[in-house]
UniProtKB/Swiss-Prot annotation:
Keyword Ribosomal protein in annotation: no
PROSITE patterns recorded: START
Function of the protein: Plays a key role in steroid hormone synthesis by enhancing the metabolism of cholesterol into pregnenolone. Mediates the transfer of cholesterol from the outer mitochondrial membrane to the inner mitochondrial membrane where it is cleaved to pregnenolone.
Gene Ontology MF terms: cholesterol binding; cholesterol transfer activity
Boundaries of the annotated transit peptide in chain numbering: 1-63
Phosphoserine modified-residue sites: 57, 195
START domain sequence ranges: 67-280
GN (gene name): STAR
Species annotation: Homo sapiens
One Pfam family it belongs to: START
The name this protein goes by in its record: Steroidogenic acute regulatory protein, mitochondrial
Recorded metabolic or biological pathway in which this protein acts: Steroid metabolism; cholesterol metabolism
SUPFAM superfamilies: Bet v1-like (SSF55961)
GO CC terms in record: mitochondrial intermembrane space; mitochondrial matrix; mitochondrion
Amino acid sequence: MLLATFKLCAGSSYRHMRNMKGLRQQAVMAISQELNRRALGGPTPSTWINQVRRRSSLLGSRLEETLYSDQELAYLQQGEEAMQKALGILSNQEGWKKESQQDNGDKVMSKVVPDVGKVFRLEVVVDQPMERLYEELVERMEAMGEWNPNVKEIKVLQKIGKDTFITHELAAEAAGNLVGPRDFVSVRCAKRRGSTCVLAGMATDFGNMPEQKGVIRAEHGPTCMVLHPLAGSPSKTKLTWLLSIDLKGWLPKSIINQVLSQTQVDFANHLRKRLESHPASEARC
């Protein structure tokens, strides 16, 4: 695949390629994504994670009809990188330690990942079909502040293609105001591979959203949510949320760990209440 793509690029004259900016960008993207696929490939203990990681390389290996700018291509590649890194972390089952477990089975685990830091993993089962969760978490993303008190506001700043977004999120104070207001600028991508939906993201730069006065610019990533039907109960959804955040500022690690772990527990509770109180529309993952 990589050799064929390279021959395709080299077979055209320099002058011809110079006049086809869009094709050149897409060919470079195809080579880059194929390299990433080979570097990140390999067996994983989880079939659905392996399926997503393998098929997600199609984003770069297909020449899109839409012509993207250099910056848009960079955002697309960032989103792909976030997905690959996050799924790679989830696929490694070793080293996870239990932080908490609720009476309803909701479980938070954590581990330290080299070059990333401490990450948190929430595993829950929601009594709603996967399409309903996708609708709330992606299609109605900007409404999250209505039902999640840990989020004041989410705005989609730019949409790139069908499944990549640049977002600005303003988080509420936490831990009795010991953690002041934070905001995040992130690139997010949402994809479906077979019966699995993945929502991934990481911090990025966006010129039209500089740091705000009185708010600390924190950083996400890599992070992701994985949704798939519960085995044997397709009307229920298994949700796995990998959370990795650098809150910045001077905060004790004990406070950070407490805030992030509790954030995941609270999120699951608020999400269930939202799904129960608001009917589904026709959105599909």
